[in-house]
Amino acid sequence: MKDVTKVALLIARAMCTSSGTFVFELAFSIAECAGRPLGGGRSKYARRRRAISIARCHRCYRLWPPTVFTTRCDNKYCVPGISYNVRVAQFIDEGVTEVIPSVINKRE
């Protein structure tokens, strides 16, 4: 939400300098449609850090370090299984901001 507001202010400022009109509602809707800024926690380091924080493998989303019952993960050449926990995968890949619904989605 904070990134959307920053982008909306930048768009509104650019609109004001180019056309002379300041319409924040239009700039905010453009910023919402633009999506996430570049980077945004999607690096390999960030994925590995989030996976370690919940004791999962960053490649296949299984428990790491493996137990006696989890033999398919070697943390180098593993792939996700047929049915894996989508919420865990979403948290590892995109971070906590994508797992928790935003305030705008709750109102609709």
Curated annotation (Swiss-Prot):
Where are the stretches annotated Basic?
47-50
Which GO terms fall under biological process for this protein? regulation of DNA-templated transcription; symbiont-mediated suppression of host innate immune response
Keyword tags: DNA-binding, Host-virus interaction, Inhibition of host innate immune response by virus, Metal-binding, Suppressor of RNA silencing, Viral immunoevasion, Zinc, Zinc-finger
The molecular function terms in GO held by this entry are: DNA binding; zinc ion binding
The stretches annotated as zinc fingers (C4-type) lie at: 57-78
- What protein family does this chain belong to? Belongs to the carlaviruses nucleic acid-binding protein family.
* Function summary: Suppressor of viral-induced RNA silencing. The potential mechanism of action is based on sequestering siRNAs.
According to UniProt, the name of this protein is RNA silencing suppressor
Provenance organism: Potato virus M (strain German) (PVM)
